[in-house]
C-alpha cells in the first residue's frame, strides 16, 4: 500500500445492540433499524492500526495459501484495499476474492463513503503488497483480520461479546 495517511472509515461498522441485521460473517456492515450505523475513524497516528496493516502484509502468503486450497470449515476469504482519489483514502473490504496473475480480484463489499465513482459490488484488483488487511473464517474463528482485531480492542468486553454473538465469529485479540 502506498499511502501516507491511514484512514479507515466505513469498512468496519461495529454496533452492539438488538435489532441488528448482520449481512456478512465478518460484519463489514451491521445496520441498526432506524438509526445510523456507528463508524470508527482511525487516524494515521494510530500505531496499532499501522502495526495491523504491517502484520497483514507480512503474513499475506498464509492467506494466499489458504485461499488457493481452503480446508474444510474455512470460508469468507476477503482482503481490504485502500482506495485513493483526490487526496481521499478509504479502506474497503473485497469479497468473493480470487488470486490470479499475482493479484487479488474481488468485489467491493462496503458502500464507499469518500471515493466517488466507486460502488458496492464493483469488481477491482489489488496487489498483495498493497492490501491493508486480509481475513477469513475458520470454524467460526477469525483468521487474519488484523485491523478488525485492532478496532475490537477499543470496544468494551460487553460490546466485543455482543459483536461476536451477532456475527457468529470469534475474535481473539491476543
Positions of PLM-derived features:
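Mixed-charge, low-complexity intrinsically disordered regions
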Residues: 17-93, 98-174
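Bacterial N-terminal signal peptides that target proteins for export
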Residues: 1-7
Amino acid at each position: 500500500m502506498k499511502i501516507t495517511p491511514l484512514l479507515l472509515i466505513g469498512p468496519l461498522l461495529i454496533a452492539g445492540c438488538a435489532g441488528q441485521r448482520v449481512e456478512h460473517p465478518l460484519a463489514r456492515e451491521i445496520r441498526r433499524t432506524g438509526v445510523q450505523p456507528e463508524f470508527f475513524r482511525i487516524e494515521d497516528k494510530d500505531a496499532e492500526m499501522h502495526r495491523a496493516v504491517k502484520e497483514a502484509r507480512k503474513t499475506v502468503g498464509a492467506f494466499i495459501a489458504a485461499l488457493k486450497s481452503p480446508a474444510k470449515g474455512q470460508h469468507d476469504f476477503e482482503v481490504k484495499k485502500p482506495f485513493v482519489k483526490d487526496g481521499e483514502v478509504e479502506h474497503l473490504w473485497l469479497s468473493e476474492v480470487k488470486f490470479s496473475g499475482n493479484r487479488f480480484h474481488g468485489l467491493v463489499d462496503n458502500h464507499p463513503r469518500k471515493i466517488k465513482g466507486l460502488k458496492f459490488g464493483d469488481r477491482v484488483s489489488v496487489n498483495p503488497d498493497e492490501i491493508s488487511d486480509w481475513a477469513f473464517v475458520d470454524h467460526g474463528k477469525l483468521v487474519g483480520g488484523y485491523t478488525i482485531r485492532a478496532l475490537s480492542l477499543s470496544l468494551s468486553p460487553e460490546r466485543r461479546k455482543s459483536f461476536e454473538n451477532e456475527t457468529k465469529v470469534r475474535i481473539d485479540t491476543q
